[in-house]
């Protein structure tokens, strides 16, 4: 019984990473850019129908909804070899095509105007699935469409489908270089409020670190968007392998999320991946045993979120899920886990068990790989709060001077006052406090004092 997942791609960033994700899925399942199963793809043990459905003529169509308020990226997808892959009815471009101008308020209020058209598409897609498990939303939090329209959709999805899971892949802005979006801290904070309140699970893709990894580890001088998006699609496809190549564990989304998120608000996950290579043809001369892979996943340099050093707080893991792909002997897994615990290679919360789960998954038979074993770590770690602290600091600087607020005042939500900004700041501040509380043994009773 497949539990289907509908992917929603929003804005420039969401559609670009979504495009790479579908390219990767097609390659892994032996599906051509037109959606036709390749001649050599005869192994019937994968589950294509979690992410695809079949048209009348048997070709595969992604369960994806592509939304944007300006046409550039979606047009480039429609002019690519993968143009015929998508269902044209699932592509929504706003009439006037002016975009949201990197303004959260504009994206949000356009969402209010066009939500009926968008939900017609989403409802049709949901009705077409046997037992829909949830939605995956790809977007960035710094721009206008991904953040504003994304926030609006998150709120509405909760109202419309209260029992369905909502997982997001959220791209956080690059802090190493100057942003061309001056209101980025406002956009990010307003979106973070929705990610805290309306999503079940947020996979944080931090552009700062992705750029550093591309430069330092993959030795790319000036990484392009395309190369960064390939890294992202690797993470996205690896995090869904257990759904597509089902084993006896973690073969649905709730199984993945449940082991990682013991308390509902602390649902921001970071990822790590090893071994990282861009060039498939270069076989890296490294031994990849399960222990090597698991040990490397715990090294900070493989983790794809840049967290600041915090001397006051003893940050720790709340839970870890390692998805290991390749030729693995299950007894090795047990030994590796024991060794990680004995050597205390990971520092865990004081109020619960040291939860390291391992999901074994097959590799796609159709893709050549230079490594016997590769691994993805999805970790719930309290230091992710430093990312939110950084956003709050930048927000406070702008808010104190009331900088750039006139762009927001044009929209209905900010006509009267800026309460929405201040409540968002409050929500994110509480989230940071809760992450700090989770590093202390008395966290279990912390919630009770708050109520």
UniProtKB/Swiss-Prot annotation:
SMART domains: Tubulin (SM00864), Tubulin_C (SM00865). Keywords: Cytoplasm, Cytoskeleton, GTP-binding, Microtubule, Nucleotide-binding, Phosphoprotein. The modification Phosphoserine is found at residue 131. PROSITE patterns: TUBULIN. Phosphorylation at Ser-131 by BRSK1 regulates centrosome duplication, possibly by mediating relocation of gamma-tubulin and its associated proteins from the cytoplasm to the centrosome. It comes from the Eukaryota. Pfam families: Tubulin, Tubulin_C. InterPro entries: Gamma_tubulin, Tub_FtsZ_C, Tubulin, Tubulin/FtsZ-like_C, Tubulin/FtsZ_2-layer-sand-dom, Tubulin/FtsZ_GTPase_sf, Tubulin_C, Tubulin_CS. GO terms for molecular function: GTP binding; microtubule nucleator activity. GO terms for biological process: cytoplasmic microtubule organization; meiotic spindle organization; microtubule nucleation; mitotic cell cycle; mitotic sister chromatid segregation; mitotic spindle organization. It is found in: Cytoplasm, Cytoskeleton, Microtubule organizing center, Centrosome; Cytoplasm, Cytoskeleton, Spindle. Its main location: cytoplasm. One of its GO terms (cellular component) is cytoplasm. GTP binds at residues 142-148. Tubulin is the major constituent of microtubules, protein filaments consisting of alpha- and beta-tubulin heterodimers. Gamma-tubulin is a key component of the gamma-tubulin ring complex (gTuRC) which mediates microtubule nucleation. The gTuRC regulates the minus-end nucleation of alpha-beta tubulin heterodimers that grow into microtubule protafilaments, a critical step in centrosome duplication and spindle formation. Belongs to the tubulin family. Component of the gamma-tubulin ring complex (gTuRC) consisting of TUBGCP2, TUBGCP3, TUBGCP4, TUBGCP5 and TUBGCP6 and gamma-tubulin TUBG1 or TUBG2. TUBGCP2, TUBGCP3, TUBGCP4, TUBGCP5 and TUBGCP6 assemble in a 5:5:2:1:1 stoichiometry; each is associated with a gamma-tubulin, thereby arranging 14 gamma-tubulins in a helical manner. Gamma-tubulin at the first position is blocked by TUBGCP3 at the last position, allowing 13 protafilaments to grow into a microtubule. This is Tubulin gamma-1 chain. It comes from Canis lupus familiaris (Dog).
